[in-house]
C-alpha cells in the first residue's frame, strides 16, 4: 500500500517533496504535504497560508486548517490522530493518507468541487463542524507543546548530552589515572622485589667469598676410634663376600657345562626317533612331562640369573664403599700433614688466596666492562645501519612517489594538450559547420530571389569565401569606414580584397566570367609581350643595388654534416660518443659550446693566438672553402646585430653621461678578444640578467665552432637546433640562403604583373641544405621519464658509504640540485619538444627529405649499432653525391675546352678611338673574375657584352637543343664583326643563302641591351609601378562595382515581383456586398419563397450583385495595369544599364591608359638607349566619354570626364525598321517597346565607344611610327648618300615599304648637293663603326616598333572582349527586367480571370438556392480570387437535436428486473439484516408481495400466479434447515440468468480482490470492487439504434455487477464494504451440491481442491440424497435429465481425477475457515452417517474439534486438506451438505404457468446447458 501511495503522490500529484516509504511519517508530520494534496484537488483554498516549517506554530496552523476539509471528505480525523502524525508515530500518516486517497477518488468520480460539498451539508452540521473545529484547535494546542518549550527541551537535551559525554570523559580519565597509578605501583613493587633479590644475591656472594676464604684445619683423629673399627669390620666382610662370590661362579660354570652336554644328546635322540616313527599312529607319549621338566629347568635358570645379578650389584656397592673409605683415609692423611705446618704459613696462604680472589674479581669485572663496551658499539653500529636503511627506504619511497607524481603531472599535461587540441579541432569544425550553414542559408535566400537559378558568379564567389574560411554574410558596413576600422570591418575588407583579386585574375587570364565568347573563339589571344617584359626587368635590375653572390667551391667536400635530435634522455649523447670512437667526426653540443665560450671570455682569449692557429690550419688545408667566408661574414653580421640590442641601455645612458675611461678600456679590450670570447661575454651578460640566450647568439656560437673545424672533418650537432627559428638562422648562416626570402621571391614572381620576364626561369631553385642528414631518436614520453628515474635511482644507489662526510654532503647537495633541476625541467623539455617538433619536421622534410626517424626505445648497444649503420649509409650517400658532382664539373670543363676549338677565329675588333670605348672595354674583364649566378648580372655594364651569360643560362630550358651551344650568348657588338668580316675588302663576294632573320619578340630574337643612363631606371621603374597599380586598382574597382551591382539587380527584381504580388493581394470590399446580400436573402419570410415574383426579384438582386462585383474586378485590374506601367516607366532599368555601361567604359579607359603609359615608357626607354633626349609629350591622354545618367545641363569646364547624353530612338522611327525584336516574342507589348528602343540605343553607344577607343589606339601606333621615320630622316640628312643595304634589309616590312621608299627618294633628292660639296676621306675602321651603329639603331627601332605592335594587338583584343561582355551584360539585364514585366502581366491576367470565375460560381450558387427555395445557412466567402462555402461558420443556428430516452429494462421469461431485485433486497434487509429469515415468514412475505401488488410491480407477471403451496415449496428449496431461509441466496437464484463461474474463474477473481485489498482486511469498497471486477463484464456489443428517439438497449450484466455489490455489502459501514470471500462462497454454488462444497473449499483455501477418487459411490449417494430432498417427485422427466447430467459430471470428474497432480490438496486449512465454509442453522439434530440434515454450527464446531484431534492436531493447528478429506465425518458432511446446491425454482414457476403443460424442460438441464 505504501508503494501505491508513494506512486500516487510522486507520479500523479507530483507533490513538492519526494515521498518514500521510509520517510513517510517525517514528510507528513508538518501537515504541509496533506494540504498540498487537498489543494491539488481544489479542496484547500487557504493553502497559501500553510507553512513548510517544522515548528509547533506552523504544525498547529496547518492541522487546524486541515481538520474541516478532512471532516468534509468523511475522513476520521481528531486531535489524537493529529498528535500521532506530528510525533511521527509509525503507520498513522499512511493510514490517514489511504483514507484520504479513497475519499478523494470517490470525490473525483462524483465530480463535485469543495464548494459544492460544503453547500450540500446541512446548515446545522456546518455550525456544529465550526464548533468542533474550534474545540479541535484548542485540544490540539494543549497536546502540542509550544516551540519555545520544544527549543528549551532541545537545548536542555543537548546540554544533558554534553554533560553525559563530559561525565563519561571524567570517568574515563579517572579510570585512566587509576590504571596509571596501579601500573606505577606495580612497577615500583617489581623494582623493589628485583632490588631485594639483587641485594640478597650480593650478600650471598659475599658470604660465599668469606666462607671460601676461611680455611678450616681439622683435628687429628686417633686410630682406635669407633669409626675406624667399623671400617675394618666392613673390609673384612667385603673380602669374605668376594670369596663366596668367586666360589659360586665356579660352581655355576660347572653346572652349565653338564646341562649343555645333556641337551645336545637329547636333541640327537629325538631327531632319530622322529624320522623312524613318522608313519606310525600318534599314541600316548610323555611329551607333557618332558615339557614340564624343561619349563622347571628354564625357571630355575632364570632364578639363578636373577640371583647372580643381585649378587653382582651387592658386590659393586661394597666396592664403591671401599673406595670411598680409602679416599677419606687419604684426605685424613693429607690434613694431618698440613696440620703439621706452622701458623704463619697458614696466614700467608690465606692472604695469597685472598689476593688471588681479588685479582680474579678485577679480571672478571674488566672482562664484563669490555663486553658491555663491545655490545654498546655493536648496538650503535646496528642503530646507525638501521637508521640509514630506514632513511634509504624512506628516500626510495619519496623517490617513487616523486616519480609517480611526475608521471601523473605528465599525464595531466598530455591530457590538457589533448583537450586543447580537441577544443581547437572542435572550434575549427564548428566554424566550418557554421560556414556550411551560412552557405546553405545564403543559397536558399538567393534561390528565393532568383527562382532557383543562382548565377554562376555568385556561387563561385561564395565558394571562394567558404574555401578561404571567411564569413559569407556581411559582418559590418564599409560605407562609413573610420580611421581605425573594427574587426568586422577588417574582415569585410579582406573579403573584398579576396573577391577583387579573384575577379582580376579571371579578367587577366580570360577565364570564368571573362572567358572568350563564342564569336571570339576563333581569335587567338595575343601572347605576352616579351620585349616589354625584358625592358621592365632590365630596368628593375638596374635600379636594384649590386649583389655579391658566393661562388661554388671547385671541389665538393666529402665531410659529412648532420645533427641528432630527440627528447631528453633519448640517447643522443651516448650514440654520438659511440660514433666518435669509430669515425673522425666532431660532436658539437650547444651546452658545451656555450660553457667554452664563457670560459674563453674569462680566460681573455686574444685574437693573436687564434690567428696563428687559423694560419696553421690554412696551410694544412690547401683547398679553399666557400662556406668559411660565408660563415665568417654571417657571423660578423650576427655580432653586429646582436650588439645593437645589448648596447641600447649604454647608448641611452651615454646621452646623459660622458663615457668613463674604464668603459672605453673595456670596449677596447673586448674588441681584442676572439669571436668566441666576445660571444661568451654576451652570453654571460644575458645569463646574469636572468634572461635566456637568444637563438641568434646560439647560432653564432655554433657557426663559430663549425668554422674552427677542418674542412675534411665532419661534424654532428647534439640536440641542436631545437626550434624552427634556430633551424632557419643556422641554415642561413651556413648556406647563405634564406628560404623565406626565396619563397617570397617565388610568390612575387607569381604576382599578377603586366610584364613577364622572358629570361627568368619559372621554377625557383631549391636552396642547399645546411645538413646532410637529420636523425631523430624517437621515444615516448613515459620512456623519457622512466630513463630519468632510472638514472636518478642509479645515482642514488651508487653513493659510497665510506667517503669523507664533508665531501659526501657537498656531492649530495650538488647532485640533489642537479636532480631537482632535471626534475623541474623534464616536463618543460618534453612540452617544448612537442611544441616545436612538428614545424621542425616539416622544415627538414619539405624541400628535400633529409630526416631519418629511428626508434630509440631499445637497449643502449642496439641503439648505438643502429645509429652507426645509419651514419655509414649517410656517409656513402655523401660520397656518391660528391663524386657525381665532380664528374659533372669535369664534363662541363671538357665541353668548355672543346667549344673554343670548334668555333672559327674571329678577327680582332677595331681599336677604340675614343676614351669612352676604353672605359667600356674594362668591365668585361672585371666581371669575368666573378661569374654571376641565377642569370642575373651583378652590375649592368655600359655595353651589351654583359648580357651573354644571362642569355645562355636563361634560355637553356626554353630553347631547342640546336641552339643550346650557339655562341649567340655573346653581345651584339661582338657579333657584328663576325657577320661582316668580308666588309674589310672592297670586293664583295657573293653571299650564300642565309636563313631569314628572326622577328623581334620571338624566342630567337636577341634583345638590345645597350647601356642606358642611370636616371632612366630611377624614373621609369616607379613610373611602371604606378602604371601597374593604377591599372590593377582601376580594374578591381570596376569589377567590384559590377559584382555589387549584380546583387542589387537581383534584390530589386525580387522586391519588384513580391511588391506587385502584394499589390495584387490587397484587400477588397467584395465580401461586404456578399454578406449583405446573404443576410437579406435569408431574412426573406417563409411564405414568400415559392412566389414567382419574389424569385424574379431575387434573381435581379443577384444580377445587381454580380455587376457590382464585376465593376470591382475591373477597377482592380486597371489599378494593377497602372501599377505595372509605373514600374516599367521607372528609370531604374535605364539607370542600371547606364551605370553598367559606364563601368565597362571605365574598363576600356583602363586598357587605353595602360597602352598610352606603356607607349610612353617604351619611348623613353629606347630614346634613352639611343642617348636621345626624351620628348616632352604635352598632348593629353585620350579619354573615353561616359554616359550621362541625368539630363541636367552642366558646363563642360565643370566636368572632369567627358559625358555623352543618352538618346533614345523614337517609336515612330523604330516601327519602320524591319528588325525582329529578340526580346519581345509573340504579341507586341507596347509598354515594353520603349525598353527595347533604349536597349538598341545603348548598344549603339557601346559600339561607338569601342570603335572610338580602337581608332585611338591605332592612331597612337601610327603616330609613333611616323615620329620614328621623321627622326630617321633628320638623322640621315647630314649623312652620306651611299647605300646602306644592311639597314634596308633589316628594316623591310610590307606595310611600311611605300613611305620608306618615298622618303628615301626625297632624301636622295634633297641631299645630293651636300654630298657633292663634302667628300672627306673615311677609313675602313670608321666605315665598320658606322655600319655597326646603323645596325644597332635599326635593331632598336625594330624592337621598339615590335613592342608597340604587341601592345596594340593586346589592347585591341581586350577592348573587343570588353565590348562583347558589355553587350552580353546589358542584354542579360534587360532580359531579366523584361521577364519580370511579362510575369507581372501574366499574374495580372490570371488573377482577373480567377476573380471573374469566382463571381460566376457565386452567382450559380445563389441561383440554385433561389430555385430550390432554401436558405443559405453556411457563409458564402468571396475574397480576392477565391470563392467557397465556409462549412465552419453558419449564419443562423441549427435546430436542437432530439434527446434520446434512458434505457428501460423489460421483463423477459419471468426474470426479475434489477429494480425488482433492489426492492426485494431493501425489504429483506429491513426485516432480516443478517441474511437469514424463517421459512414461514419468508413465504408470508412473498405471498403478501404477490397478492397485494397494487401498482408496485414487485414481481414479473409469471410470479403473480403463485399460490401459497407453491410459495412454500419455493421456500423449501431454499431452506437451510427445517426453519431458516437465506434470502441473499434466493435473490441470487432469482437474478438468473447470469454466467455461472468455473472454479478457475472464482480463484482468479479471488486473487484480483486480494491484490486490490492491500491492507488484507478481507473487505473492499465499491471502487475497489469495480477495479477488481468479476468473471464477467457488461455487454460490450450493444447496438446503438439509428433512431435518436429510440432508447439504448438495457445492459443487464453491468447492472447485475453493481447489484451483487449492493446485495452482499455491509451498509452499516461508511463507505459500504464487501466481504469478497463470503460473496464468492455464495457464487460457489453448483447444481451438484458436492461439487459446490469442493468449490467452496477451493475459494476458502485460495487454491484448487481436488476430489478424491471414490466418485461412483459418492455420485450414487449424491443422487439418492438429491432425490430424497427433491420436492418434484411428480415429474420424473427432470429427475431423469438430472441423473444423466450427474453422469456427465461424473465423467468429467473422472477426467479430472486422471489429471490430479501428486502434491494436490497440500494446502493448510484452519478451524475458522472450515466453520466459514459449513455455516448451518441453529436447530440441533442428531449426527450420524445417514442424517440428511446439516448439523448446527455448535455441533459442527464440536465435531470439527474432534476431527482435528483425531487427525493429530491437538491444539487445533491448521492441517492439510488432503488429510482432512480422508476423515469419514468430513466425507459424510460433504456428501450430505445441501447449502451449495443451486435450487431450480423455475420448475415451480413453470408448473404455475402451465398447470396442465407437460412439454416444458426441467430447469436443472437448462442450467447445465447454460454452464456448458
From Swiss-Prot:
Comp. bias (Pro residues): 902-913
Region annotation (Interaction with IFT20) ranges: 1317-1669
Keywords for the protein's UniProt record, in alphabetical order: Cell projection, Cilium, Coiled coil, Cytoplasm, Differentiation, Flagellum, Golgi apparatus, Spermatogenesis
Claim: Signal is one of the keywords in the record: no
GO biological process: sperm axoneme assembly
Coiled coil location: 178-260, 374-403, 724-750, 803-827, 868-897
SUPFAM superfamilies listed in its UniProt record: EF-hand, P-loop containing nucleoside triphosphate hydrolases
Residue ranges, compositional bias (Basic residues): 1292-1310
Top-rank taxon, per record: Eukaryota
InterPro entries attached to this UniProt entry: CH_2, CH_dom, CH_dom_sf, EF-hand-dom_pair, P-loop_NTPase, SPEF2_C, SPEF2_D5, Sperm_flagellar-bone_growth
Region listing for Disordered, in residue ranges: 618-658, 879-1002, 1272-1322, 1793-1812
GO cellular component, as recorded: Golgi apparatus; manchette; sperm flagellum; sperm midpiece
Biased composition (Basic and acidic residues): 618-630, 879-897, 914-929, 943-961, 1272-1285
Disulfide bond entries: none
Localisation per UniProt entry: Cell projection, Cilium, Flagellum; Cytoplasm; Golgi apparatus
Start and end residues of each Calponin-homology (CH) domain: 1-105
Family annotation (Pfam families): ADK, CH_2, SPEF2_C, SPEF2_D5
Tissues showing expression: Predominantly expressed in ciliated tissues. Mainly expressed in testis, followed by trachea. Also expressed at lower level in lung, kidney and liver.
Disease link: Defects in SPEF2 are a cause of immotile short-tail sperm defects, an autosomal recessive disease only found in the Finnish Yorkshire pig population. It specifically affects the axoneme structure of sperm flagella, whereas cilia in other tissues appear unaffected. Sperm flagella are short and malformed, with disorganized mitochondria and loss or disorganization of the outer fibrous sheath.
Subunit field text: Interacts (via C-terminus) with IFT20. Interacts with DYNC1I2.
Purpose: Required for correct axoneme development in spermatozoa. Important for normal development of the manchette and sperm head morphology. Essential for male fertility. Plays a role in localization of the intraflagellar transport protein IFT20 to the manchette, suggesting function as an adapter for dynein-mediated protein transport during spermatogenesis. Also plays a role in bone growth where it seems to be required for normal osteoblast differentiation.
Protein name per Swiss-Prot or TrEMBL: Sperm flagellar protein 2
Organism of derivation: Sus scrofa
Biological classification of the source: Eukaryota, Metazoa, Chordata, Craniata, Vertebrata
Amino acid at each position: 500500500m505504501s508503494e501505491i501511495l508513494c506512486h500516487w503522490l510522486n507520479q500523479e500529484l507530483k507533490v513538492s517533496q519526494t515521498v518514500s516509504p521510509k520517510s513517510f511519517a517525517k514528510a507528513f508530520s508538518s501537515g504541509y504535504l496533506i494540504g498540498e494534496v487537498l489543494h491539488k484537488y481544489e479542496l484547500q483554498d487557504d493553502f497559501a497560508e500553510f507553512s513548510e516549517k517544522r515548528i509547533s506554530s506552523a504544525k498547529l496552523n496547518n492541522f487546524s486548517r486541515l481538520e474541516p476539509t478532512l471532516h468534509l471528505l468523511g475522513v476520521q480525523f481528531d486531535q489524537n490522530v493529529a498528535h500521532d502524525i506530528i510525533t511521527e508515530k509509525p503507520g498513522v500518516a499512511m493510514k490517514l493518507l489511504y483514507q484520504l486517497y479513497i475519499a478523494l477518488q470517490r470525490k473525483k468520480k462524483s465530480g463535485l468541487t469543495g464548494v459544492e460539498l460544503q453547500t450540500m451539508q446541512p446548515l446545522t452540521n456546518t455550525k456544529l463542524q465550526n464548533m468542533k473545529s474550534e474545540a479541535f484547535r484548542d485540544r490540539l494546542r494543549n497536546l502540542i507543546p509550544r516551540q519555545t518549550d520544544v527549543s528549551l527541551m532541545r537545548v536542555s537535551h543537548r546540554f544533558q548530552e554534553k554533560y553525559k559525554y563530559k561525565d563519561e570523559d571524567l570517568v574515563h580519565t579517572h579510570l585512566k589515572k587509576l590504571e596509571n597509578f596501579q601500573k606505577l605501583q606495580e612497577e615500583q613493587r617489581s623494582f623493589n622485589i628485583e632490588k631485594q633479590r639483587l641485594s640478597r644475591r650480593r650478600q650471598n656472594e659475599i658470604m660465599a667469598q668469606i666462607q671460601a676464604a676461611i680455611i678450616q684445619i681439622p683435628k687429628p683423629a686417633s686410630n682406635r676410634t669407633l669409626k675406624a673399627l667399623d671400617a675394618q669390620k666392613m673390609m673384612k666382610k667385603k673380602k669374605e663376600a668376594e670369596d663366596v662370590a668367586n666360589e659360586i661362579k665356579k660352581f655355576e660354570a660347572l653346572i652349565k657345562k653338564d646341562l649343555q652336554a645333556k641337551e645336545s644328546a637329547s636333541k640327537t635322540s629325538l631327531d632319530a626317533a622322529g624320522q623312524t616313527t613318522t608313519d606310525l599312529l600318534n599314541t600316548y607319549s610323555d611329551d607333557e612331562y618332558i615339557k614340564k621338566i624343561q619349563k622347571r629347568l628354564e625357571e630355575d635358570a632364570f632364578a639363578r640369573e636373577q640371583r647372580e645379578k643381585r649378587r653382582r650389584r651387592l658386590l659393586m656397592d661394597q666396592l664403591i664403599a671401599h673406595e670411598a673409605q680409602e679416599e677419606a683415609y687419604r684426605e685424613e692423611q693429607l690434613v694431618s700433614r698440613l696440620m703439621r705446618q706452622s701458623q704463619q704459613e697458614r696466614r700467608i696462604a690465606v692472604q695469597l688466596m685472598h689476593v688471588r680472589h681479588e685479582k680474579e674479581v678485577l679480571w672478571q669485572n674488566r672482562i664484563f666492562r669490555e663486553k658491555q663496551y663491545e655490545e654498546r658499539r655493536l648496538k650503535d653500529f646496528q642503530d646507525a645501519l638501521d637508521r640509514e636503511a630506514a632513511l634509504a627506504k624512506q628516500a626510495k619511497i619519496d623517490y617513487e612517489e616523486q616519480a609517480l607524481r611526475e608521471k601523473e603531472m605528465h599525464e595531466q599535461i598530455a591530457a590538457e594538450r589533448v583537450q586543447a587540441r580537441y577544443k581547437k579541432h572542435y572550434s575549427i569544425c564548428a566554424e566550418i559547420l557554421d560556414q556550411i550553414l551560412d552557405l546553405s542559408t545564403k543559397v536558399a535566400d538567393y534561390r528565393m530571389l532568383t527562382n532557383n537559378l543562382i548565377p554562376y558568379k555568385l556561387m563561385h564567389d561564395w565558394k571562394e569565401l567558404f574555401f578561404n574560411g571567411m564569413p559569407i554574410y556581411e559582418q559590418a558596413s564599409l560605407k562609413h569606414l573610420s580611421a581605425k576600422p573594427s574587426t568586422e570591418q577588417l574582415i569585410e575588407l579582406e573579403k573584398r580584397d579576396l573577391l577583387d583579386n579573384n575577379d582580376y585574375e579571371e579578367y587577366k587570364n580570360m577565364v570564368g566570367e571573362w572567358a572568350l565568347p563564342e564569336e571570339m573563339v576563333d581569335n587567338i589571344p595575343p601572347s605576352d609581350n616579351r620585349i616589354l617584359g625584358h625592358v621592365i626587368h632590365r630596368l628593375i635590375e638596374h635600379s636594384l643595388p649590386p649583389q655579391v653572390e658566393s661562388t661554388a667551391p671547385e671541389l665538393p667536400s666529402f665531410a659529412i654534416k648532420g645533427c641528432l635530435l630527440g627528447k631528453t634522455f633519448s640517447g643522443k649523447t651516448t650514440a654520438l660518443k659511440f660514433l666518435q670512437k669509430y669515425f673522425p667526426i666532431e660532436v658539437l653540443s650547444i651546452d658545451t659550446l656555450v660553457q667554452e665560450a664563457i670560459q674563453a671570455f674569462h680566460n681573455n682569449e686574444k685574437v693573436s693566438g687564434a690567428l696563428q692557429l687559423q694560419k696553421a690550419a690554412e696551410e694544412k688545408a690547401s683547398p679553399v672553402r666557400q662556406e668559411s667566408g660565408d660563415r665568417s661574414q654571417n657571423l660578423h653580421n650576427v655580432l653586429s646585430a646582436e650588439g645593437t640590442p645589448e648596447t641600447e641601455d649604454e647608448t641611452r645612458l651615454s646621452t646623459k653621461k660622458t663615457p668613463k675611461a674604464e668603459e672605453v678600456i673595456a670596449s677596447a679590450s673586448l674588441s681584442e678578444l676572439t669571436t668566441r670570447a666576445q660571444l661568451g661575454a654576451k652570453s654571460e651578460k644575458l645569463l646574469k640578467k636572468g634572461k635566456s640566450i637568444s637563438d641568434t647568439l646560439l647560432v653564432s656560437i655554433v657557426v663559430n665552432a663549425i668554422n674552427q673545424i677542418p674542412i675534411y672533418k665532419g661534424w654532428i650537432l647534439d640536440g641542436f637546433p631545437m626550434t624552427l627559428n634556430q633551424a632557419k638562422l643556422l641554415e642561413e648562416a651556413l648556406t647563405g640562403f634564406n628560404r623565406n626570402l626565396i619563397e617570397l621571391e617565388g610568390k612575387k614572381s607569381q604576382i599578377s604583373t603586366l610584364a613577364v620576364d622572358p629570361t627568368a626561369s619559372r621554377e625557383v631553385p631549391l636552396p642547399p641544405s645546411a645538413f646532410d642528414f637529420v636523425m631523430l631518436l624517437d621515444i615516448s614520453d613515459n620512456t623519457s621519464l622512466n630513463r630519468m628515474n632510472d638514472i636518478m635511482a642509479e645515482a642514488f644507489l651508487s653513493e659510497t658509504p665510506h667517503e669523507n662526510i664533508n665531501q659526501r654532503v657537498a656531492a649530495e647537495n650538488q647532485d640533489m640540485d642537479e636532480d631537482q633541476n632535471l626534475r623541474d625541467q623534464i616536463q618543460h623539455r618534453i612540452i617544448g619538444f612537442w611544441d616545436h617538433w612538428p614545424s621542425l619536421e616539416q622544415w627538414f622534410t619539405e624541400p628535400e627529405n633529409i630526416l631519418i626517424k629511428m626508434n630509440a626505445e631499445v637497449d643502449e648497444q642496439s641503439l648505438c649499432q643502429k645509429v652507426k649503420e645509419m651514419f655509414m649509409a649517410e656517409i656513402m650517400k655523401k660520397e656518391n653525391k660528391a663524386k657525381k658532382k665532380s664528374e659533372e664539373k669535369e664534363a662541363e670543363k671538357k665541353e668548355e675546352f672543346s667549344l673554343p676549338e670548334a668555333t672559327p677565329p674571329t678577327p680582332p675588333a677595331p681599336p677604340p678611338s675614343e676614351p669612352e670605348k676604353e672605359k667600356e672595354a674594362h668591365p668585361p674583364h672585371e666581371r669575368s673574375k666573378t661569374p654571376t649566378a641565377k642569370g642575373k648580372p651583378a652590375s649592368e655594364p655600359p655595353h651589351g657584352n654583359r648580357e651573354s651569360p644571362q642569355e645562355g643560362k636563361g634560355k637553356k630550358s626554353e630553347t631547342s637543343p640546336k641552339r643550346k651551344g650557339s655562341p649567340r650568348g655573346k653581345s651584339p657588338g661582338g657579333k657584328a664583326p663576325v657577320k661582316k668580316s668580308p666588309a674589310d675588302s672592297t670586293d664583295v663576294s657573293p653571299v650564300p643563302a642565309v636563313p631569314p632573320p628572326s622577328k623581334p619578340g620571338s624566342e630567337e630574337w636577341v634583345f638590345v641591351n645597350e647601356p642606358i643612363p642611370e636616371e632612366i631606371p630611377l624614373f621609369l621603374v616607379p613610373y611602371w609601378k604606378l602604371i601597374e597599380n593604377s591599372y590593377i586598382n582601376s580594374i578591381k574597382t570596376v569589377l567590384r562595382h559590377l559584382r555589387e551591382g549584380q546583387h542589387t539587380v537581383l534584390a530589386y527584381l525580387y522586391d519588384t515581383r513580391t511588391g506587385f504580388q502584394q499589390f495584387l493581394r490587397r484587400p477588397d470590399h467584395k465580401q461586404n456586398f456578399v454578406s449583405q446580400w446573404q443576410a437579406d436573402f435569408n431574412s426573406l419570410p417563409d411564405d414568400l419563397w415559392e412566389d414567382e415574383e419574389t424569385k424574379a426579384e431575387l434573381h435581379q438582386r443577384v444580377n445587381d450583385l454580380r455587376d457590382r462585383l464585376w465593376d470591382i474586378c475591373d477597377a482592380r485590374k486597371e489599378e494593377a495595369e497602372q501599377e505595372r506601367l509605373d514600374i516599367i516607366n521607372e528609370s531604374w532599368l535605364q539607370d542600371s544599364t547606364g551605370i553598367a555601361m559606364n563601368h565597362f567604359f571605365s574598363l576600356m579607359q583602363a586598357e587605353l591608359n595602360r597602352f598610352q603609359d606603356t607607349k610612353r615608357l617604351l619611348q623613353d626607354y629606347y630614346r634613352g638607349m639611343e642617348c636621345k633626349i626624351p620628348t616632352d609629350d604635352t598632348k593629353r591622354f585620350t579619354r573615353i566619354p561616359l554616359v550621362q545618367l541625368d539630363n541636367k545641363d552642366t558646363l563642360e569646364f565643370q566636368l572632369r570626364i567627358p559625358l555623352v547624353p543618352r538618346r533614345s530612338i523614337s517609336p515612330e522611327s523604330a516601327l519602320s525598321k524591319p528588325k525582329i525584336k529578340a526580346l519581345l516574342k509573340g504579341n507586341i507589348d507596347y509598354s515594353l517597346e520603349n525598353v527595347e528602343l533604349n536597349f538598341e540605343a545603348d548598344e549603339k553607344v557601346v559600339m561607338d565607344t569601342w570603335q572610338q577607343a580602337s581608332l585611338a589606339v591605332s592612331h597612337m601606333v601610327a603616330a609613333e611610327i611616323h615620329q620614328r621615320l621623321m627622326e630617321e630622316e633628320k638623322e640621315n640628312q647630314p649623312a652620306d648618300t651611299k647605300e646602306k643595304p644592311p639597314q634596308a634589309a633589316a628594316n623591310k616590312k610590307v606595310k611600311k615599304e611605300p613611305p620608306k621608299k618615298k622618303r628615301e627618294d626625297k632624301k636622295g633628292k634633297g641631299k645630293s648637293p651636300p654630298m657633292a660639296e663634302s667628300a672627306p676621306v673615311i677609313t675602313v675602321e670608321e666605315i665598320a663603326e658606322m655600319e655597326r651603329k646603323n645596325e644597332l639603331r635599326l635593331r632598336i627601332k625594330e624592337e621598339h616598333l615590335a613592342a608597340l605592335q604587341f601592345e596594340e594587338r593586346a589592347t585591341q583584343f581586350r577592348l573587343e572582349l570588353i565590348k562583347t561582355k558589355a553587350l552580353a551584360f546589358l542584354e542579360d539585364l534587360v532580359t531579366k527586367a523584361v521577364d519580370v514585366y511579362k510575369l507581372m502581366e501574366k499574374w495580372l491576367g490570371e488573377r482577373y480571370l480567377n476573380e471573374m470565375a469566382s463571381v460566376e460560381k457565386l452567382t450559380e450558387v445563389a441561383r440554385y438556392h433561389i430555385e430550390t427555395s432554401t436558405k443559405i445557412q453556411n457563409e458564402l466567402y468571396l475574397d480576392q480570387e477565391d470563392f467557397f462555402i465556409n462549412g465552419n461558420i453558419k449564419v443562423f443556428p441549427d435546430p436542437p437535436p432530439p434527446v434520446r430516452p434512458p434505457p428501460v429494462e423489460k421483463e423477459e421469461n419471468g426474470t426479475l428486473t434489477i429494480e425488482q431485485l433492489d426492492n426485494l433486497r431493501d425489504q429483506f434487509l429491513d426485516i432480516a439484516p443478517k441474511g437469514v429469515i424463517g421459512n414461514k415468514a419468508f413465504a408470508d412475505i412473498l405471498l403478501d408481495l404477490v397478492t397485494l401488488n397494487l401498482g408496485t410491480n414487485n414481481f414479473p407477471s409469471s410470479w403473480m400466479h403463485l399460490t401459497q403451496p407453491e410459495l412454500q415449496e419455493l421456500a423449501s428449496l431454499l431452506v437451510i434447515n427445517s426453519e431458516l431461509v437465506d434470502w441473499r441466496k434466493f435473490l441470487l437464484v432469482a437474478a438468473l440468468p447470469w454466467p455461472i463461474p468455473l472454479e478457475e474463474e472464482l480463484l482468479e477473481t479471488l486473487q484480483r480482490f486480494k491484490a486490490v485489498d492491500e491492507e488484507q482486511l478481507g473487505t473492499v469498497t465499491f471502487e475497489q470492487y469495480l477495479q477488481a471486477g468479476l468473471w464477467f463484464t457488461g455487454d460490450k456489443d450493444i447496438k446503438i439504434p439509428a433512431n435518436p428517439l429510440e432508447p439504448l438497449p438495457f445492459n443487464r450484466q453491468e447492472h447485475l455487477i453493481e447489484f451483487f455489490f449492493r446485495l452482499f455489502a455491509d451498509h452499516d459501514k461508511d463507505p459500504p464494504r464487501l466481504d469478497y470471500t463470503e460473496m464468492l462462497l455464495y457464487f460457489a454454488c453448483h447444481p451438484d451440491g458436492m461439487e459446490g462444497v469442493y468449490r467452496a473449499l477451493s475459494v476458502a483455501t485460495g487454491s484448487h481442491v481436488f476430489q478424491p477418487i471414490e466418485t461412483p459411490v459418492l455420485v450414487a449417494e449424491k443422487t439418492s440424497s438429491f432425490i430424497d430432498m427433491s420436492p418434484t417427485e411428480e415429474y420424473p422427466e427432470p429427475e431423469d435429465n438430472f441423473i444423466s447430467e450427474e453422469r456427465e459430471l461424473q465423467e468429467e470428474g473422472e477426467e479430472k481425477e486422471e489429471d490430479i497432480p501428486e502434491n494436490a490438496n497440500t494446502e493448510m486449512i484452519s478451524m475458522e475457515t472450515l466453520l466459514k465454509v459449513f455455516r448451518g442453522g441453529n436447530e440441533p439434530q442428531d449426527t450420524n452417517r445417514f442424517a440428511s440434515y446439516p448439523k448446527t454450527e455448535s455441533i459442527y464446531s464440536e465435531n470439527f474439534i474432534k476431527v482435528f484431534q483425531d487427525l493429530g492436531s491437538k491444539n487445533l493447528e491448521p492441517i492439510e486438506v488432503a488429510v482432512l478429506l480422508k476423515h469419514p465425518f468430513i466425507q459424510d458432511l460433504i456428501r450430505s451438505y445441501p447449502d451449495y446446491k443451486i435450487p431450480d425454482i423455475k420448475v415451480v414457476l413453470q408448473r404455475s404457468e402451465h398447470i396442465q403443460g407437460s412439454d416444458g424442460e426441467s430447469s436443472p438441464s437448462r442450467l447445465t446447458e447454460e454452464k456448458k
